[in-house]
C-alpha cells in the first residue's frame, strides 16, 4: 500500500524518454529500444504491428493484407530514420529492395500526410490512427507483428523507490501483451 504516490505523466519520443530515465528525470519510461544506453534495462511490455495505411480511394485499399513487394509501384512514406522506429522500417524496406521518404516523427504526422495524398505509408498501428476515418489499414503478412516492441525502461544506476518498484511489478504482472511467439 503506497498512499503518497503521485504520477506525473509526460509524453515524449523514445530517445528523450530513455535519456530522461538515464538522467533520473523519470523513474520509469515506456518507449522503443534505444541503442547505446547501457545503464538502462528494457523490459518488453507490448507491441504495435507495422501496417500500411492508404486513403480509402487508393488502389491498395481493396486489400486487407499484403506483402511488402506489393508496394514496389507506389510512393511510400514513413518515419524519419533518426528515430528508432524509422531505422527499423528502413532496414525492413532495404531488405526487400524498397525505398520510402523518411521524414515524419509520429503516426499523426504520417496519417495527416496520407490523408491528403495518393501515397502509401508504413506506420505503427497506434490509437492515434483512429481519428482518420478515410484511411484503410492493411496488414503486412511478411513483417513480424512484434517488429515494434514497446518496453518499460528503468535505470540500473538510479535509486528506485518501493512505489516505483511496485508499479513496475504491476505492469509486468498485469499489462504484458506480447505476441504468442515472443
Predicted regions and their residues:
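Hydrophobic hinge/microswitch elements
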Residues: 13-18, 22-26, 82-139
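Central regulatory/effector-binding core of bacterial HTH transcription factors
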Residues: 1-37
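Flexible hinge/capping segments at coil-to-helix
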Residues: 42-50, 54-76
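Conserved functional loop/turn residues at catalytic and ligand-binding sites
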Residues: 6, 20, 24-25, 44, ...
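Secondary-structure junction motif
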Residues: 74-96, 125, 160-168, 178, ...
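Generic preference for hydrophobic
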Residues: 9, 30, 42, 52-53, ...
Amino acid at each position: 500500500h503506497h498512499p503518497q504516490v503521485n504520477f506525473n505523466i509526460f509524453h515524449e519520443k523514445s530517445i528523450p524518454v530513455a535519456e530522461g530515465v538515464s538522467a533520473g528525470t523519470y523513474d520509469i519510461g515506456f518507449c522503443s529500444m534505444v541503442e547505446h544506453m547501457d545503464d538502462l534495462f528494457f523490459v518488453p511490455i507490448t507491441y504495435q504491428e507495422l501496417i500500411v495505411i492508404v486513403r480509402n480511394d487508393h488502389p491498395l485499399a481493396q486489400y486487407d493484407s499484403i506483402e511488402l513487394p506489393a508496394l514496389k509501384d507506389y510512393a511510400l512514406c514513413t518515419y524519419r530514420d533518426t528515430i528508432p522506429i524509422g531505422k527499423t522500417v528502413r532496414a525492413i524496406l532495404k531488405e526487400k529492395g524498397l525505398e520510402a521518404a523518411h521524414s515524419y516523427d509520429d503516426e499523426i504526422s504520417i496519417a495527416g500526410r496520407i490523408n491528403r495524398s495518393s501515397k502509401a505509408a508504413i506506420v505503427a498501428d497506434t490509437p492515434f490512427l483512429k481519428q482518420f476515418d478515410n484511411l484503410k489499414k492493411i496488414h503486412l503478412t511478411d513483417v513480424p507483428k512484434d517488429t515494434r516492441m514497446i518496453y518499460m525502461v528503468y535505470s540500473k544506476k538510479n535509486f528506485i523507490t518501493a512505489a516505483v518498484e511496485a508499479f513496475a511489478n504491476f505492469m509486468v504482472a498485469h499489462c504484458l501483451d506480447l505476441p504468442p511467439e515472443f
